[in-house]
Design a protein with these regions (language model features):
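Long, low-complexity C-terminal extensions of enzymes
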Residues: 183-198
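Non-heme Fe(II) oxygenase catalytic core, chiefly the N-lobe of the double-stranded beta-helix
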Residues: 1-128, 141-150, 157-182
């Protein structure tokens, strides 16, 4: 709402739309928040994300197996690097193929599973502007920032299906009103392509 022109330029990137539509189909809802980790910032514990990823193991166990299977299909997690991030700065740790572990929403808090994660995760250095998208059931955790002076900054994206429910509440009317003018102006003067507008 404070910088709609910047928002339009940032999120009009066709690559972001392509990743989101490939996972969720059209009419998805995007929420975003900046994650800033200063030098010395500690690593997160391995976890899964929304929806069931934020529940206790006991609460997750009350949902039938098909809900565990469906939940990660309703959301796409993403991140856009706002600075160069070498391995020392602690980019996100990922456990390949862990999204296939069906009881993962119940298991991720177990110490034996966390130990397995720490022994087998991978990390990818990112350059400013790089994006990463992944299934929210993939076990992941922000790494420890062991750098002396790099403030690791990532724009975390949570993209929800048109049939899902976003974790954050969004004032859609206010956002539409704020973006209408900049979108219309960029379209009228040719600074926005049809692919970017979509």
């Amino acid at each position: 709402l404070e910088a709609p022109e910047v928002f339009v330029r940032y999120f009009a990137t066709p690559a972001i739309d392509a990743a989101c539509e490939a996972w969720l189909g059209p009419n998805y809802q995007m929420t975003a928040q900046i994650n800033l980790v200063h030098p010395g910032g500690k690593a997160q514990q391995a976890h899964r994300d929304y929806h069931l990823g934020f529940q206790t193991a006991e609460v997750s166990a009350t949902y039938p197996a098909h809900v565990h299977d469906l939940s990660p299909l309703m959301t796409l997690q993403g991140g856009i690097a706002h600075c160069d991030m070498d391995l020392e700065s602690g980019p996100t740790k990922l456990l390949p193929f862990s999204q296939l572990y069906r009881p993962g929403y119940v298991a991720w808090r177990r110490e034996d599973f966390r130990a397995h994660f720490e022994a087998n995760h991978v990390q990818l250095p990112l350059s400013k502007g790089d994006a990463i998208f992944f299934n929210p059931a993939l076990f992941h955790a922000a790494g420890e920032n062991r750098s002396a002076d790099l403030r690791r900054m990532v724009n975390l994206l949570q993209v929800s299906s048109a049939f899902g429910r976003a974790m954050e509440s969004v004032d859609r009317v206010a956002i539409c009103k704020a973006l209408h003018g900049p979108l219309r102006a960029r379209w009228a003067d040719g600074r926005l392509t049809e692919a970017e507008l979509d």
